[in-house]
Amino acid sequence: MLSKKYRFHSRGGVRFTYAHGKTIRTPKISLVYNENSRGFQRVAVVVSKKVEKSAVKRNRIRRRVYEAIRAEFEHAPKKHDFIFVVYSKDVATMDFAELCTLVNSLFSQSVI
């Protein structure tokens, strides 16, 4: 899990990022990102009830994505806010290396 410093603390930042951010979409996960003035990255992972009804399974997906983000965090651009929105329950069972590759590719596309 990422340190609390690198996570969103309130809904205001998430709403601002949704409203003013740019989106990169893949079939399983999309990334909404926006530049911030804090000097470090902030990250949130969103898994809706449409993806998985069970809260236990949604939290498992969220923990896996946070762990993949933590593994690839040094490749993330500085001074940006990131919201990962999960669209597929396949993320719960996909290979962790594949998930890390997906997160890394989203980070690299956000730099361009």
What does each of the following model-derived ranges do?
Residues M1-I112:
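Positively charged, solvent-exposed patches that mediate nucleic-acid binding
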